[in-house]
């Protein structure tokens, strides 16, 4: 009845007991799950959430010192010498999914989190930047003022995923190339060659990024004078002034509902605020991680889907899908409301859908 040494939070008898040693994650250091939970606890302690601080107060009071402490702790959790491959789950027979798509707290709840209920374990890449891999002038540890808004996004992302991480439904993994420079170089080279051989564009992804960028500017300029905000948006997006005024008024009417509105004056200086737009893992890393972990690739990104489709094996120029008809029949899965509200997987009909997907996966593998 002891807890398993792999750090899953489960009993040994229901976790690694029947898993061959070579397919287990390491027991000698803290697991990915344990590091993520430690990071979330540290965030809550530093920001005073554990003592009752509200999110509104945090947006008003977030300090450079808090940002430095949070990212410094993250860099300690994930040093450069981390043996990431010993920490990643292996292809051990569990029905595992790997999400590849837009990593933003405003979009992760749309598809990535809801679909996690269908898998034994669901992998999502963390959007948190590791300061160990940055030059000092770009690091949140040495330039925290530039990271005030990005820190809000990172903090909220972690705290909203924390319950799913705690229950073992979602494993928030770092990019393996952060700890393997040769891998990173190879990935960048392959990505460069692929992008120059064929250009892929997707209007839906582009539309989301445009809306996100407008939202980011609205959130970070919330306390600026109206004329300054109008000028910034007009110049940034080449929008009509009347259209910009309408956008700002609509935002201001609901500013209390915007969980990312920075409720303190921006004082980032001449360097401005750092804002990250992240889609990950990239195509090459997605294929590598899915093979290493034995994961089904899951995406809601039109761009990533096109990349995956373009890479399919072709016979005489045509792509054939042996399982196409059957997979197209499984085009709708039920939403697990209990999973989204109480972080517990529903049984019954949803359990049947879960088992069906597992069987299809096994049939294809066999």
PLM ranges: what are they?
Residues 1-366:
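Acidic/negatively charged segments and metal-coordination signatures
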């Amino acid at each position: 009845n002891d807890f398993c040494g792999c750090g899953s939070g489960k009993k040994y008898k229901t976790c690694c007991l029947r898993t061959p040693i070579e397919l287990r994650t390491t027991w000698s250091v803290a697991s990915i799950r344990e590091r993520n939970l430690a990071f979330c606890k540290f965030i809550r302690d530093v920001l005073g959430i554990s003592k009752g601080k509200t999110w509104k107060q945090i947006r008003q009071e977030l300090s450079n010192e808090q940002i430095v402490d949070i990212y410094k702790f993250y860099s300690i959790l994930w040093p450069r010498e981390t043996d990431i491959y010993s920490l990643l789950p292996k292809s051990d027979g569990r029905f595992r999914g790997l999400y590849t798509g837009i990593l933003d707290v405003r979009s992760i709840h749309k598809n990535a989190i809801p679909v996690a209920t269908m898998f034994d374990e669901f992998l999502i890449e963390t959007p948190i930047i590791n300061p160990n891999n940055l030059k000092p002038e770009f690091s949140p540890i040495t330039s925290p003022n530039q990271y005030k808004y990005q820190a809000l996004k990172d903090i909220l992302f972690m705290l909203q995923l924390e319950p799913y991480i705690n229950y073992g439904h979602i494993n928030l993994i770092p990019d393996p190339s952060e700890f393997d420079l040769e891998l990173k170089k190879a990935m960048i080279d392959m990505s460069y060659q692929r992008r120059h051989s064929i250009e892929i564009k997707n209007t839906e992804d582009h539309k989301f990024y445009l809306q996100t960028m407008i939202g980011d500017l609205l959130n970070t300029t919330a306390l600026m004078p109206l004329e300054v905000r109008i000028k910034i948006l007009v110049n940034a997006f080449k929008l009509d002034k009347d259209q910009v005024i309408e956008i700002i008024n609509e935002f201001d009417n609901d500013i209390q509902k915007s969980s990312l509105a920075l409720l303190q004056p921006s004082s980032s200086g001449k360097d401005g605020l750092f804002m990250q737009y992240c889609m990950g893992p990239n195509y090459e890393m997605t294929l590598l991680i899915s093979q290493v972990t034995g994961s089904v690739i899951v995406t809601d990104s039109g761009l990533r889907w096109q990349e995956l489709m373009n890479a399919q094996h072709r016979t005489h120029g045509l792509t054939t899908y042996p399982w196409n008809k059957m997979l197209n029949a499984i085009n709708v899965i039920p939403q697990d409301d209990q999973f989204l509200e109480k972080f517990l997987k529903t049984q019954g009909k949803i359990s049947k859908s879960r088992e069906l997907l597992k069987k299809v996966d096994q049939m294809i593998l066999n």
